Amino acid sequence: DTLRIFVLGESAAMGTPEPAFGFSRILERLLHHRYPDQAFEVINLAMRGINSHMIRRIAMEAAVYEPDLVIVYAGNNELVGWQAPEPDQAPLRPLKMIRAQQALLSTRLGQWLWQRIRPFKDEWNQEQDMAFFRKHHLSAKDPRREEVLSRFAGNMSEALEVFVVQRVPVLVGSVLVNERDFPPLGFPSSSEATPLNDPLFALPWWQACEGGDREWLEEQLP
């Protein structure tokens, strides 16, 4: 019998920038090589630009196909992305409203209506380049971060629960972060304390920049 493995996640799980070299393809080749007498199907259900709100829906639909193993690698798009907080937005959109929109868009009638009533310029359909991410970065002290983390935990719990009740094994991977070569996208505004005045930030920052040009770095900060 064929063993079916589902991969859930976002662009990193999909294999961006080239899905042909994503870890799901590599995993499938490794399994075929290690167990030549066993048939495997590694099905990548990841998508670029989504987050746990969508992963929850995908998981519920995927569970119907009774996979033998599920691999989840997600968490990159919670603070910047669809339904994420924006710097100039006050409260987060109510969770019930998000759920209602998703339910509506799961129907053909809802999709037809959405195409006609949504704004002509949908910002989240634009290219998400570095300028986009710099525009949407949030302060480390933004209180909405806690709500985002709470929603992420809730969404993932519901997504995993549908497989747990079916006794399907689930592997959940931590999101990798390249802290050495990928500095913060931005710094607090002038109305807030600068990073170098924050003792929780300053020490690890300078330690990470050891060997660099400290004077040049100071000139770049607000």
Stretch-by-stretch model annotation:
Residues 1-35:
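Membrane/wall-proximal cationic-aromatic binding patches
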Residues 2-4, 38-41, 65-70, 164-171:
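Loop/turn elements at helix/coil->beta-strand transitions in domains of secreted/extracellular proteins
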Residues 8-9, 45-48, 73-75, 173-176:
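Active-site-proximal beta-strand/loop segments in catalytic clefts of secreted hydrolases
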Residues 11-18, 44-45, 142-149:
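Second-shell loop/turn segments in exported
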Residues 14-17, 52, 80-81, 181:
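Short, solvent-exposed loop/turn elements at domain surfaces
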Residues 37, 75-222:
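Serine-dependent acyl-ester chemistry module
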Residues 42, 48-59:
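Structural motif
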Residues 55-69:
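Short, well-structured alpha-helical segments in soluble
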